[in-house]
């Protein structure tokens, strides 16, 4: 897995065309309406749906107002610089309501739950679960077979570009509503307790808790039993 450099992300955002895509349901005398090459139109008789940039569609609607009986416009962004990730080729389980931006890497067998937000440049390893409403900021990197609990936040680092991103090594379990601040590395096999605020690196195979988080013990068999990663939850259809 390759992490994007902060300057690469900044350049990507800077040079991207800022878009306001819309979906418009339209009713009226539509036979001779032309929305141009940049707009997809699906018109049948006096009703139809068009997809495209709002400025282009709005111009056609205004020019042909006398022919149009009614419209409904669906719009969820304005001058957006980063599209959402095309999920069709991702070999992972991604549930409805997850927001995943372009230029995110997701490993095979990962699980992204409802409401998770994953920003540009983030990397998610094979078999890792990102639970409900968790947030992975820009360039946050999570290794293989981890669990990032519901509502947890891995701080993002794009600006300033010199700052170090959050790195979560393999086999880490992060409890619900924990916060991992910029530049922190969590060592392999570690456990971050629910609600912890992690401001410093976490040694491998330790448990940290509190605000700010401190090491409270080494990983033992009891802890392993409580934080076991279940591979059954990560199987895709072809793995069954």
UniProtKB/Swiss-Prot annotation:
EC number: 2.3.1.89
Any one GO BP annotation for this protein: lysine biosynthetic process via diaminopimelate
Function: Catalyzes the transfer of an acetyl group from acetyl-CoA to tetrahydrodipicolinate.
Protein name: 2,3,4,5-tetrahydropyridine-2,6-dicarboxylate N-acetyltransferase
Family: Belongs to the transferase hexapeptide repeat family. DapH subfamily.
Pathway it works in: Amino-acid biosynthesis; L-lysine biosynthesis via DAP pathway; LL-2,6-diaminopimelate from (S)-tetrahydrodipicolinate (acetylase route): step 1/3
Pfam families per the UniProt record, alphabetical: DapH_N, Hexapep, Hexapep_2
Gene name of the encoded protein: dapH
Keyword flag Repeat: yes
Origin: domain of life: Bacteria
GO molecular function: tetrahydrodipicolinate N-acetyltransferase activity
Key words, A-Z: Acyltransferase, Amino-acid biosynthesis, Diaminopimelate biosynthesis, Lysine biosynthesis, Repeat, Transferase
Species this chain originates from: Shouchella clausii (strain KSM-K16)
InterPro entries per UniProt: DapH, DapH_N, Hexapep, Hexapep_transf_CS, Trans_hexapeptide_repeat, Trimer_LpxA-like_sf
Catalytic activity annotation: (S)-2,3,4,5-tetrahydrodipicolinate + acetyl-CoA + H2O = L-2-acetamido-6-oxoheptanedioate + CoA
């Amino acid at each position: 897995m390759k992490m994007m450099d902060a300057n690469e992300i900044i350049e990507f955002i800077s040079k991207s065309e800022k878009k306001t895509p819309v979906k418009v349901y339209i009713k009226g005398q539509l036979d001779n309406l032309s929305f141009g090459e940049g707009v997809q139109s699906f018109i049948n008789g006096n009703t139809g749906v068009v997809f495209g940039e709002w400025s282009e569609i709005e111009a056609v609607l205004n020019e042909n107002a006398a022919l149009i009986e009614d419209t409904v416009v669906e719009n969820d962004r304005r001058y957006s610089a980063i599209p959402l990730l095309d999920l069709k080729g991702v070999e992972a389980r991604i549930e409805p309501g997850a927001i995943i931006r372009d230029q995110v890497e997701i490993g095979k067998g990962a699980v992204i739950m409802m409401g998770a937000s994953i920003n540009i440049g983030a990397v998610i390893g094979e078999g890792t679960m990102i639970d409900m409403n968790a947030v992975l900021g820009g360039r946050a990197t999570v290794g293989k077979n981890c669990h990032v609990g519901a509502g947890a936040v891995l701080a993002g680092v794009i600006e300033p570009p010199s700052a170090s991103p959050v790195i979560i090594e393999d086999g880490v379990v992060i409890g619900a509503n924990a916060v991992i601040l910029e530049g922190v590395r969590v060592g392999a096999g570690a456990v971050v307790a629910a609600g912890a605020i992690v401001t410093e690196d976490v040694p491998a195979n330790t448990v940290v808790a509190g605000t700010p988080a401190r090491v409270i013990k080494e990983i033992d068999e009891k802890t392993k039993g409580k934080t076991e990663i279940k591979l059954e939850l990560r199987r895709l259809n072809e793995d069954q």
